[in-house]
Swiss-Prot record:
GO terms, molecular function: guanyl-nucleotide exchange factor activity; small GTPase binding
Localization per record: Cytoplasm, Cytosol; Membrane
GO biological process, one term: retrograde transport, endosome to Golgi
Subunit and interaction comment: Forms a complex with RIC1; the interaction enhances RAB6A GTPase activity. Interacts with RIC1. Interacts with RAB6A; the interaction is direct with a preference for RAB6A-GDP. Interacts with RAB33B.
Taxonomic placement: Eukaryota, Metazoa, Chordata, Craniata, Vertebrata
One GO location term (cellular component): Golgi membrane
Protein name listed in UniProt: RAB6A-GEF complex partner protein 2
Amino acid sequence: MIEVVAELSRGPVFLAGEALECVVTVTNPLPPTATSASSEALAWASAQIHCQFHASESRVALPPPDSSQPDVQPESQTVLLPHRGERGQCILSTPPKILFCDLRLDPGESKSYSYSEVLPVEGPPSFRGQSVKYVYKLTIGCQRVNSPITLLRVPLRVLVLTGLQDVRFPQDEAVAPSSPFLEEDEGGKKDSWLTELAGERLMAATSCRSLHLYNISDGRGKVGTFGIFKSVYRLGEDVVGTLNLGEGTVACLQYSVSLQTEERVQPEYQRRRGAGGAPSVSHITHARHQESCLHTTRTSFSLPIPLSSTPGFCTAIVSLKWRLHFEFVTSREPGLVLLPPVEQPEPATWTGPEQVPVDTFSWDLPIKPEASHTFLSVQPASYCYSVRSHIRAI
């Protein structure tokens, strides 16, 4: 039996354009109760990164596959199929890299190999939605002599930061170490430069604070004013807003605000509803705040953006957008007063009305979450992610 261990030193979360580094260790373990063991021979091992795409048949109408594409890969490529046995289509893959060939391990012996690859910037981010799924994996294929190929898959999470797709890595002199006594390899320079640039762009986009005011009105008058300081946020940050109802001419009885994502299938890929298709637009609520606000002049809310969520993006098949979805319940009666009178001629019991005629309306405000600094500042020594696989003899 051969044991293969893949270890990511800095965790499974990466930025598109960043270099992934993985250490693959191949071991021929020595059984503790075995009296004798033989050496094991491995023909080869290869690794590559691929993005698997899967669409819901009830929501997305994909064109038929191209029959002109051959089912068998040409002899010039490796026989490794990273997406073998998985649902969907492989829409993006890096060139395979050979880790070793003709490896023989004695009992108890192990060998380690380093794999490095830059994550493509032209691909979509990792996403699991109602209509489509984009899943990234690092696949390591290993084959024993005269045995089938065994695959080891390491799940990855890839984030895309707006504006980095067109950035080119500068020349060596532009990213030289600040100290002449420090040495840094080419991959480390590029990785640190990209992380620093992403952090600067993210800070510039999310640190700008300017109060934006929105008048909220229905068909009968003004309900209130909503205030928010910015529209670009980081994953894990709180969306804070204030609502001023004291200036309104229409009484607001209750309001709710939801932090939602809108997943919309592009028109050319939408499945017709008459053919048994599901809606082409789906909404997911990540956080919600509800409050009864009669006689409330000013209130506020705070909604956290989950770290596990995906920032907005757009592909040829689907788009994802974020929004604040407001729902207001207002009174139809002008000048509604539900307080007891201040002066009572004699002791009496006051009760509120059993029924109040109301109207409801909604309002959507787009916002834009971006990748978080939490993912851009993970230190190699603080996180270790490993996956194990066993290759057994026939």
